[in-house]
Amino acid sequence: QLNFSPGW
């Protein structure tokens, strides 16, 4: 499982 959360 891969999670990507951008800081913008």
From Swiss-Prot:
One of its GO terms (cellular component) is extracellular region. The modification Tryptophan amide is found at W8. GO terms for molecular function: hormone activity; pigment binding. The modification Pyrrolidone carboxylic acid is found at Q1. It comes from the Eukaryota. It is found in: Secreted. InterPro entries: Adipokinetic_hormone_CS (IPR002047). Keywords: Amidation, Hormone, Pigment, Pyrrolidone carboxylic acid, Secreted. This hormone adapts the animal to light backgrounds by stimulating concentration of the pigment of its red body-chromatophores. Belongs to the AKH/HRTH/RPCH family. This is Red pigment-concentrating hormone. It comes from Penaeus merguiensis (Banana prawn). The lineage of its organism: Eukaryota, Metazoa, Ecdysozoa, Arthropoda, Crustacea.
